[in-house]
Amino acid sequence: MQEKSRVFKWDINDFKEKSFKKPTLNLTWDYKFNPHYDEILINENIEWLKGTKLFSNESDYEKFISLKTSYMNAYLYSHGNREVFRYINRLNEYIYIIDDLYLEDSVYGQEWVNQLFDRNSKLFKEDHGSSFLWQIFDDIRSAGNSEATDYLIKKTKEWMDSVILFNSKEVHSNYTFEEYSSYRGVEVGMIFALACTKVHLPPLCDEIENHPLYIELLGKYFNSIQVLINDIHSFNKEIKSSRLGNYVKIAAYQLGSIQSAMDHSQKICNDYIEAMEEKCLELESIFPNNKDLETHLYLIKTIIAGNYYGSKDPNYPRYNGTVCEADYK
């Protein structure tokens, strides 16, 4: 079969039928909403954000707050205590801003990221935003687990590295899902998010962490499910962007229909959810009666469920409202 002509830029006008319905997933895993969300007061959050000096315009802080990233964070990081949630929320807000303003549009590159994570660098000594990030890490360490914080720092840098790598790739419409997710899997940020939600716990033992099945569970299944949840629910806000970095857009060109692309993404995601459940059971059979593994697998499932139900929540305006990142870019 002859390969279709490659498309490198998204254009909604390439499709006659522009209406679509977001699909539901066969997801029965438990999720909860962090009970300390209401204690992270808006006024406190605004003052903290202003202290980062990441925005140049005063009004941009209020616009960012209106995106309610803290609301989604309460879905993703539902198990931490008040202090853990406060500092993880701050880290995620910092990351959202860095991604939207600097990394996504390639304003900063790999050299900047390398310096950002080097406490002996010139950037750390001279740039307020860099020292602010490390203050957040120090606060997380004081409230959480030290080893888990080191792991989180590592995964935060890996995520930033992956954004830069993904931006350097020329994504086109003939990508298979496997090809797309191999680049997008880390860039979507959910391994970083998983490190956030586990920061109050001791890390898994090396025997489990380095087991091929556990690595496959995260790298293939967890990442792929999260990529599809993100792409399905962020499609609304990305529909006017020419960037092709969304699997629904890629599948739409392959299938000739946005709705067909949504339905196709749903099927892939449901298949991965079913397969991941089987992989979890297989891991538990290899490491029977291991309470640490059971806890970590539970958290892996709850962060997937939290991402899904948070993305669907009509009170979350980033995916379900009229406010978008472009308003403060």
From Swiss-Prot:
Biological process, per Gene Ontology? terpene biosynthetic process
What GO annotations for molecular function exist for this entry? metal ion binding; terpene synthase activity
Record's InterPro entries? Isoprenoid_synthase_dom_sf, Terpene_cyclase-like_2
Sequence motif: DDxx(x)D/E motif, positions: 99-104
Q: Name one Pfam family in it.
A: Terpene_syn_C_2
Location of the motif NDxxSxxxD/E motif:
230-238
The EC number(s) this enzyme carries: 4.2.3.-
Read off the Gene3D superfamilies from this record. Answer: Farnesyl Diphosphate Synthase (1.10.600.10)
Q: Does the keyword NADP apply?
A: no
Claim: Lyase is one of the keywords in the record: yes
| Keywords assigned by UniProt, alphabetized | Lyase, Metal-binding
Q: Which domain of life is it from?
A: Eukaryota
The free-text function statement in the UniProt record for this protein reads: Terpene synthase that converts its substrate farnesyl diphosphate (FPP) into 6 yet unidentified sesquiterpenes.
Per the similarity annotation, which family is this? Answer: Belongs to the terpene synthase family.
**Can you name this protein?**
Terpene synthase 7
